[in-house]
Curated annotation (Swiss-Prot):
Native source species: Aeropyrum pernix (strain ATCC 700893 / DSM 11879 / JCM 9820 / NBRC 100138 / K1)
Stated name of the protein: CCA-adding enzyme
Catalysis: reaction(s): a tRNA precursor + 2 CTP + ATP = a tRNA with a 3' CCA end + 3 diphosphate; a tRNA with a 3' CCA end + 2 CTP + ATP = a tRNA with a 3' CCACCA end + 3 diphosphate
Family designation: Belongs to the tRNA nucleotidyltransferase/poly(A) polymerase family. Archaeal CCA-adding enzyme subfamily.
Keyword Magnesium: yes
Alphabetized InterPro entries for the sequence: CCA-adding_arc, CCA_tRNA_nucleotrans_2, NT_2-5OAS_ClassI-CCAase, NT_sf, NuclTrfase_I-like_C, Polymerase_NTP_transf_dom, tRNA_NucTransf2
Amino acid sequence: MRGASGESVLPEDLRSRVLERIRPTRLQFSMLGRLYSLVARALEECEDLRLSIPSYRVELVGSAAKGTLLRDKWEVDVFLLLDAPREEVRRLGESLLRSCLGGRLPYYFKYSEHPYATVSLMGMQADVVPAPLAVDPRDAVGVERTPFHTRYVRSRLEERPWLVDDILLFKSFLKGIGVYGAETRVGGFSGYLAEVLIIHHGGFEETVKAASSWRPPVMVDTTSGKADLDMLARRYPDSPIIVPDPVDPSRNTAASVTPKRLAELVHAANIFLRKPSPTFFHALQPGEPCRRTLPGVMVLMSGNYSDHPPDSVWGRLKRLGERLYRATKARGYPALSYSFYTDEALEAAVYIHMESPSRYPIEGRLGPPPWERERAARFTEKRLGEGGWVWIGDDGRLSGARPYTGSAAGDVERALATLPLPPGTRSYKVVTCPSTGPCGFPSYLEALRDPTPPWLRHVLGGCRS
């Protein structure tokens, strides 16, 4: 992509500098290949597996198989494709993996739409996923499509191998601005979606330029007219962006993208086109935090979160943040936004950003019309009994006000008593941060208090030392 002067928007020296930091190394591929071989051998030599489901295939999938993994990702995805009905795979998958991996490799289980094992060895990880062996991607559901996605991307990159670098750049860009990942924690762009967009638009700069002009609802037809976009719009009415899956055009591969993450990409793309900077790319971002924190209220939770699926914990945290934000606004506090965090092990937190964790000392109340005699009498007695005020407005209804002596922390405590907490939570406490200064939290929790992305402060000069 060229700018008005005919020069590339991404300077060549910056492109080279970023790629030098994010390209996977030969050593990385070699070691990950060895990890895959160890896992594949454990599965292929597993007698219990051969006796239970004789026909199966072990397949390397995902970014490592496509050559599109970032240098800091020492992970492989291994699918155990079983020639058996989906129900049987779900019934036997976990026990078979335990039998095949036990005693040979260190592993632990995670639970998503399929239970899967994570082998952890020498700082590397291999996710081992049992799935039914599907012949047609239209018969696959969820992660079962991953082998088809891998084959599709590999075939396109064999035709245009130079796009590998552009995919790496785009993934690093998405990661740098905080919108990379389809999991609930992020609600952003999956690695596969990033690859599909680069293949469709023909490069990193072309994709960023296209994104800069997006306005919801966004439609990006990556299927050369094979997809029924009207049908997809009806099927995914809440999706701000629809990108048909090239291997199954009836599916929106951008279904995980939230309005917030789409808007963040559009905003970042426009700023990047105006002011390219290494700070947009995750591998070149400054190590020192760049923050200007806001006052507010922090809810600190502790529990056993590792016993629950991460998406379940993150999803509940997000809903808790939304409801506390609405509750504090409804109580008259100048709430601005919210953020949330969990280490997926022992702690979680929600922070409500506010102009100030205080509110007006008077609270208004709308009452009934006087002809609703009992209600009107109760309303009047209650307001005056509180040392407040009562009057009749121009609309003929009773109105009132009362002194308000509550606190933001107290109101959040009362709201928490009625709201579902993340699964595994054992206890919590509420802390008020009255100013923009430090509130005594560890750095990763203080980061929740600044709703402005660090990259944005660095790029546009809002970061003060």
